[in-house]
């Protein structure tokens, strides 16, 4: 049986997308100078939060969505050799539509 991470409430598990390795002019950016990625792929999402009336508020994102998130939001999680971010829904700023 495969082990998975299932976010609770209005939390979202995101796999950050790699930052650019080179500049537009072709210069290689060292790891120490790279910005933290702010874009990632939704791996899984919780069922949504429960409002004051006891109604579950559905999530705005779903598995597979590419999202832009707050630069300093979330908790870094390392699982099975992969790095993820566990974000609150409010830390997700936009969904990238292609």
UniProtKB/Swiss-Prot annotation:
Presence of the UniProt keyword Iron in the record: no
PROSITE patterns found in the cross-reference section: CHAPERONINS_CPN10
CDD domains: cpn10
InterPro entries reported in the protein's UniProt record: Chaperonin_GroES (IPR020818), Chaperonin_GroES_sf (IPR037124), Chaprnonin_Cpn10_CS (IPR018369), GroES-like_sf (IPR011032)
Superkingdom field: Bacteria
Main localization category: cytoplasm
Any one biological process term the GO annotation gives: chaperone cofactor-dependent protein refolding
Gene Ontology CC terms: cytoplasm
Pfam families membership: Cpn10
Sorted UniProt keywords: Chaperone, Cytoplasm
Keyword Cytoplasm in annotation: yes
GO molecular function: ATP binding; metal ion binding; protein folding chaperone; protein-folding chaperone binding; unfolded protein binding
Locations listed in the record: Cytoplasm
PANTHER family: 10 KDA HEAT SHOCK PROTEIN, CO-CHAPERONIN GROES
Subunit-structure text: Heptamer of 7 subunits arranged in a ring. Interacts with the chaperonin GroEL.
Function recorded in the entry: Together with the chaperonin GroEL, plays an essential role in assisting protein folding. The GroEL-GroES system forms a nano-cage that allows encapsulation of the non-native substrate proteins and provides a physical environment optimized to promote and accelerate protein folding. GroES binds to the apical surface of the GroEL ring, thereby capping the opening of the GroEL channel.
Family: Belongs to the GroES chaperonin family.
Stated name of the protein: Co-chaperonin GroES
UniProt organism field: Cutibacterium acnes (strain DSM 16379 / KPA171202)
Lineage, opening ranks: Bacteria, Bacillati, Actinomycetota, Actinomycetes, Propionibacteriales
